[in-house]
Amino acid sequence: SSPLKHVPLSERDENDPEQKLGTVLDVILSEFDKLGYKTVYGVLDAVNYGVPQFRERFVLIGSRDDEDVFLPIPTHFQMHQDKKYQWQTVRSVIEDLEFDHGECATLSEERLKFLKMVPEGGNWRDLPKDIIPIAMGGAYKSGGGKVGFYRRLSYDQPSPTVVTSPVQKATMMCHPTQNRPLSVKEYARIQQFPDDWVFTGTTAAKYRQIGNAVPVGLAEAIGKTVLSVADNTAIVQTKRFRGTNVHNKIRNAIELGGSLYAVK
């Protein structure tokens, strides 16, 4: 996390000490403590709560009624003996929209030409070697993994994090098999909005609204946990963890009296 004080590089000299990382969070937690709040925080990935998407978000929950507070217990896993507890995939939410996808952004003819060469689940690295420098332009020699360039989703994996536009060159979100970006409706499905949810404005504005949202499954998990603390029905459960490598960690945390997870 960020240092409390930021000194621009242009204003630093060799004698300036490095600012301690994490001091912003330390101050926030200290202020909550002064106000009498118990807090718990962590980074939650929506894919672990039934959302067909990898989407990490920092979550902080607090209470000042002398209640123990918890983060929501994960409900889904990459591998689990029970399929209903396995990660949800792109296929599970958009396959039926292949020929009824609705409103959709468009790619330029230049980008579309290169996308047609990329297989399902692939990206720019799957282009012919002699084509890559042309397709990537100046980004070809830049740093970073550049995984979003000419990216097609995989039907049988969770989606990457939905961003505010599927057609930005560095963060493309393209259909697994069709030569187009994900549609507005497909975007909404991955974020778990119901089909009758109304988004307003231009096509770009609709993508932005969806991309900025908290996925329904993650929001629901947080809401239920807060409610269970408020009405004093929070209990720690481990049954659903059986068959996963998380089970022992949760069991040990309970034995130590300090589990961060709860469900209603």
Question: What residue spans do the PLM features occupy?
Answer:
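A mobile, often basic/glycine-rich helix-loop segment
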Residues: S1-D33
